[in-house]
């Protein structure tokens, strides 16, 4: 354990594009590493991605460890887990952070099992304990009703996954200098336990709500599946995405990958339009860091108005179509 040092971040990329969550985690790792007097190291796995290292350094990494191989062109569990494991075994990190995305949620447990260390999933807060210097990993428990803080005293590295949108990215500083280390991993055909025949992109490029700049979110007040059509129309006009509260998801009006809140995703878009959402504390926890919040609700006492920058008391069924027409008219000018 005394050999272990530095805070490592799995810098997720898809199709050669760095994902926002990796940049956010480097910002958080910077704070943790500064508390420990250590460095931030980003791990970049993929194919023809080495040129992305400078972006990671600009956002706060001191060093980038790159594994560039054709076997890593698309995310496949086995080759990625092997690369990650070899880096951890040769570099001995103190802490490793992953985004709680479909990739991170697949990779992190696999790696933690192989190197025999713990993993705390879906953390919403990370701190270094002043006395023990251990990583304090906080996450919602019991359906989001309490927050539990977990420590990994005996094993290294200390590992956690963190949802996109929870941590704040640092502004890019292009003048920052850093080191890039290229690591060779000897992959064999046996590592490729999956054959990718083709990658099919969906026609409507639905963006992960944590990546969207504008979100039009609906709650119980939307009323039904039909009601979400008005939200979708407005989101299309604004080049945004549709999101929802737990009530709307539980009612089956929209898929759960659109859920914002303590048991859903945490988002910080530039604009969050809350339609028929009462603003329960669990929902607010997932969106209160949005840059600008507009709330539309019939109930003028709704808690959502307490955190909204702009509030409209009224019926969304009447307001949304008019709002959509007005925005379209402005865009056409």
Predicted ranges, named:
Residues 1-333:
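N-terminal glycine-rich FAD/FM-binding segment characteristic of electron-transfer flavoproteins
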């Amino acid at each position: 354990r005394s050999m272990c040092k530095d805070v490592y971040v799995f810098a997720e990329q898809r199709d050669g594009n760095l994902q926002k969550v990796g940049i956010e985690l480097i910002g958080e790792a910077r704070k943790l590493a500064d508390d420990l007097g250590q460095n931030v190291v980003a791990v970049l796995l993929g194919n023809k991605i080495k040129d992305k290292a400078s972006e990671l350094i600009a956002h706060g990494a001191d060093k980038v460890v790159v594994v560039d191989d054709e076997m890593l062109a698309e995310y496949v569990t086995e080759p990625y887990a092997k690369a990650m494991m070899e880096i951890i075994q040769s570099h001995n990190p103190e802490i490793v952070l992953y985004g709680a995305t479909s990739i991170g949620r697949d990779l992190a447990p696999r790696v933690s099992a192989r190197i025999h260390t713990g993993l705390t999933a879906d953390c919403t807060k990370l701190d270094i304990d002043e006395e023990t210097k251990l990583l304090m990993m906080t996450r919602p428990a019991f359906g989001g009703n309490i927050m539990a803080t977990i420590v990994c005293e005996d094993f290294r590295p200390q590992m956690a996954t963190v949802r996109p949108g929870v941590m704040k990215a640092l502004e890019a500083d292009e003048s920052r200098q850093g080191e890039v280390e290229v690591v060779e991993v000897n992959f064999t055909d046996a590592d490729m336990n999956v054959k990718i025949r083709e990658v099919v992109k969906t026609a409507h490029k639905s963006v992960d709500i944590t990546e969207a700049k504008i979100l039009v979110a609906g709650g119980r007040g939307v009323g039904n599946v039909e009601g979400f059509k008005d939200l979708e129309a407005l989101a299309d006009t604004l080049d945004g995405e549709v999101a929802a509260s737990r009530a709307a998801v539980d009612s089956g009006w929209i898929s759960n990958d659109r859920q914002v809140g303590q048991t859903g995703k945490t988002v910080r878009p530039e604009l969050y339009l809350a339609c028929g959402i009462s603003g329960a504390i669990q929902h607010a926890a997932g969106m209160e860091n949005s840059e600008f919040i507009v709330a539309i609700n019939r109930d003028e006492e709704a808690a959502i108005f307490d955190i909204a920058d702009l509030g409209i008391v009224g019926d969304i069924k009447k307001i949304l179509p008019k709002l959509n027409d007005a925005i379209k008219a402005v865009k056409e000018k």
